[in-house]
Amino acid sequence: MASRKDTLVRRASRVRRQIKAVANGRPRLSVHRSSKNIYAQIIDDVAGKTIASASTLDTDLRFSLKTGADTEAATAVGKLLAERASKAGVKDVVFDRGAFIYHGRIKALAEAAREGGLNF
């Protein structure tokens, strides 16, 4: 029987394989969610570089949020990431939800990033 971590890795690799098929050179917006925080970064897979990143642990957000584990925090991270991406000149990305379902905090971050100007 596969462990929880094995199933998460398998699911994430399945999602990433689908993303590589449709990326067409666009950077990838990768999201990670833990029980206390949420992290997002825009990665250029061709160059192997991180273009922009944001999380609830950033000094811009850390003390202004009640907790890093709710949809309000995810929305703030999405807006901050979109702002940093626009400064870096990125508008079109591919959304990589990893092994997480598109619901709750993941959905809130994605919608806030779209409102901030990212296209995916």
Swiss-Prot record:
Protein name as catalogued: Large ribosomal subunit protein uL18
Keywords: Ribonucleoprotein, Ribosomal protein, RNA-binding, rRNA-binding
Chain's gene name: rplR
Known function: This is one of the proteins that bind and probably mediate the attachment of the 5S RNA into the large ribosomal subunit, where it forms part of the central protuberance.
Subunit structure: Part of the 50S ribosomal subunit; part of the 5S rRNA/L5/L18/L25 subcomplex. Contacts the 5S and 23S rRNAs.
Entry-linked Gene3D superfamilies: 3.30.420.100
GO MF annotations, alphabetized: 5S rRNA binding; structural constituent of ribosome
Family, as annotated: Belongs to the universal ribosomal protein uL18 family.
SS bonds (residue pairs): none
Organism: Sinorhizobium medicae (strain WSM419) (Ensifer medicae)
Biological processes annotated in GO: translation
GO CC aspect terms: cytosolic large ribosomal subunit
Pfam families reported in the protein's UniProt record: Ribosomal_L18p
